[in-house]
């Protein structure tokens, strides 16, 4: 019979509790700041057609985010990263991660370019009801184009969060969502008063929040020895495995996102302010 030393068990339990406490604290702060963000936007802009335009515009890159960032990182990348690290060596896992980053940045950059070009068509897909109000429709298109690059930033963040969680670094990933809210809240008071259409300042704040999220991940990535320079991923066996794993999971997640598109579209036909609520 093998006995587990109580000291080691106690130390492991202590680490788990510490990590759980850190994650819980940052999650709570993120929720509080999220509520504060909504209050600030409501206070500055009210609950009308302008905030409806912002909400609909932000929904579009967020729907893609759930496919390219959260879904792919959680369902495909992270299990493969851990498997490669355990079967081969940490260096091989880091190389795989850098190649995955190349895929992520390549795909999201292409999607962002396409999304910015075809923003009017996407806005009509998500909010056909806005077409009856040219001013609202055009503002939504403009905000969509401004915020679309957030898809690139948040996908990088999801990639780094997956690596850091696998390496037992939980503080920076847990804290990252806080800074999106910080960027939006700060922009409402600093940038919005400086631009012709104040709501555009909130769109810029989304981008700033995404950049800050990346910056706070970098020190932890350096500590675990992860390069942020994308590597050539063509003809890589593990990247091919990653793409095969992604296929079925993306189809399943896309079904749920279609539901969001339908609901947003229906809401766009309702009176101003209903989308925001």
Segments and roles (model prediction):
Residues 1-277:
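Membrane-embedded alpha-helical bundles of multi-pass transporters/translocases
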């Amino acid at each position: 019979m093998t006995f587990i030393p109580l000291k080691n068990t106690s130390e492991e339990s202590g680490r788990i509790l510490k990590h759980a406490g850190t994650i819980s604290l940052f999650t709570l702060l993120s929720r509080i700041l999220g509520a504060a963000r909504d209050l600030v936007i409501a206070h500055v802009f009210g609950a009308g057609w302008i905030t409806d335009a912002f909400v609909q515009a932000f929904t579009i890159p967020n729907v893609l985010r759930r496919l390219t960032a959260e879904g792919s990182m959680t369902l495909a990348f992270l299990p493969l990263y851990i498997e490669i690290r355990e079967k081969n060596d940490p260096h091989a896992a880091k190389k795989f991660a850098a190649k995955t980053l190349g895929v992520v940045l390549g795909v999201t950059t292409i999607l962002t370019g396409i999304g910015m070009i075809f923003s009017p068509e996407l806005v009509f897909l998500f909010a056909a009801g806005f077409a009856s109000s040219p001013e609202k429709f055009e503002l939504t298109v403009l905000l969509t184009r401004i915020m679309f690059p957030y898809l690139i930033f948040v996908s990088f963040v999801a990639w780094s969060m997956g690596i850091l969680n696998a390496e037992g670094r939980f503080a920076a990933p847990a804290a990252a969502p806080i800074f999106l809210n910080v960027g939006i809240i700060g922009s409402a008071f600093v940038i919005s008063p400086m631009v012709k259409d104040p709501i555009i300042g909130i769109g810029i704040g989304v981008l700033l929040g995404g950049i800050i999220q990346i910056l706070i991940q970098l020190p932890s990535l350096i500590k675990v020895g992860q390069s942020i320079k994308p590597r050539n991923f063509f003809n890589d066996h593990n990247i091919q495995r990653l793409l095969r794993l992604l296929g079925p999971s993306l189809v399943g997640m896309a079904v749920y996102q279609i539901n969001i598109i339908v609901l947003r579209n229906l809401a766009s036909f309702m009176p101003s302010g209903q989308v925001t609520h």
